[in-house]
Amino acid sequence: MEAEKFVLITGCSEGGIGNALALKFHQEGFQVLATARQVERMDNLTKAGLQTLKLDVTDEDSVREVEQEVRKFTNGSLHYLINNAGAPCSAPAIDLDIEDVSKVMDVNFYGVIRMNKAFQHQLIRAKGTIVNVNSLVSYVPFAFNAAYNASKAALLAYSNTLRIELAPFGVQVTSIMTGGVQTKIQSKPLGTMTEAAIPENSIYYPYRKLILENRNPVEKFVTIEEFADAAYPQLVGRGRWYQLFKPGVRPAQIWAGYMSSAGRVGSMLPVEVFSMSVRLIVKLPSTAVWRDHTVD
């Protein structure tokens, strides 16, 4: 009989990617430890028989307590750590509030570092895999999303370095380059771009309606279940041709979600090419009218 394999996933609130991945791994026979800041938001997982734990990735004490709790279940061997917890931030780059940027970085980047550091020994013992849920915006300069883009770009650079450094210990690192997915992240305070994100003294104020009208086409995004179904085989060693011969090998990057294929191609193109495409998508004027608000 095959030994139990344990998966720890952050950011598992219902309606999100983490929740769908938790259910997928559970259905495939893994022992899943699902976490979120509010346990009641994982009621569907609890009813499905999954173990749920309260975790705030921005809190060192919370991370430490969960590591100790998880150790009781895993006996010190964690096979997958999926860092999915994320925070959005939508606003013009030039108008960003440092406090908002700090909050996004604390979850999307520093939170991942905290988790990997805390669980390193459990992962090494199991020869496990770290999965950092990233986004194609780490390559693609999606307009009016600069803080989120920057947090994911930092995460990608960190992940690529971590992959090299942990290889001698038998721990693999994979980045899921996420395209458009229908999640509840857009409903969070900083996730939905509203007119409030463009103050009257902003240089974009005259174009606020145009900007809001041309945000991402959520209706075209894949569902969280479709995303989980696409990512899972590659995470467990069955989705790439070379995994037929080396099933233990995990890809450095997995691309899944709406426009992820275009993002993959775009990552190999000059930045100028993709920047031009994004400008056309958001319909920014080639020349903007500027009014100096510093002058009465």
Curated annotation (Swiss-Prot):
It is found in: Lipid droplet; Cytoplasm; Vacuole; Endoplasmic reticulum. The active site is at Y148 (proton donor), K152 (lowers pka of active site tyr). Belongs to the short-chain dehydrogenases/reductases (SDR) family. It comes from Schizosaccharomyces pombe (strain 972 / ATCC 24843). GO terms for biological process: phosphatidic acid biosynthetic process; triglyceride catabolic process. A motif (GXSXG) lies at residues 11-15. The gene is ayr1. Transmembrane segments: none annotated. This is NADPH-dependent 1-acyldihydroxyacetone phosphate reductase. Keywords: Cytoplasm, Endoplasmic reticulum, Golgi apparatus, Hydrolase, Lipid degradation, Lipid droplet, Lipid metabolism, Membrane, Mitochondrion, Mitochondrion outer membrane, NADP, Oxidoreductase, Vacuole. Its main location: other. NADP(+) binds at I9, T35, R41, D56, N84, K117, Y148, K152, V181, T183. Can convert acyl and alkyl dihydroxyacetone-phosphate (DHAP) into glycerolipids and ether lipids, respectively. Required for the biosynthesis of phosphatidic acid via the DHAP pathway, where it reduces 1-acyl DHAP to lysophosphatidic acid (LPA). Also has triacylglycerol (TAG) lipase activity. Involved in the mobilization of the non-polar storage lipids triacylglycerols (TAGs) from lipid particles by hydrolysis of TAGs. Lipolysis of TAG by AYR1 is essential for starvation-induced autophagy. Forms an NADPH-regulated cation-selective channel in the mitochondrial outer membrane. Gene3D superfamilies: NAD(P)-binding Rossmann-like Domain. GO terms for molecular function: acylglycerone-phosphate reductase (NADP+) activity; triacylglycerol lipase activity. It catalyses: 1-hexadecanoyl-sn-glycero-3-phosphate + NADP(+) = 1-hexadecanoylglycerone 3-phosphate + NADPH + H(+); a 1-acylglycerone 3-phosphate + NADPH + H(+) = a 1-acyl-sn-glycero-3-phosphate + NADP(+); a triacylglycerol + H2O = a diacylglycerol + a fatty acid + H(+). One of its GO terms (cellular component) is Golgi apparatus. Its EC number is 1.1.1.101, 3.1.1.3. Disulfide bonds: none annotated.
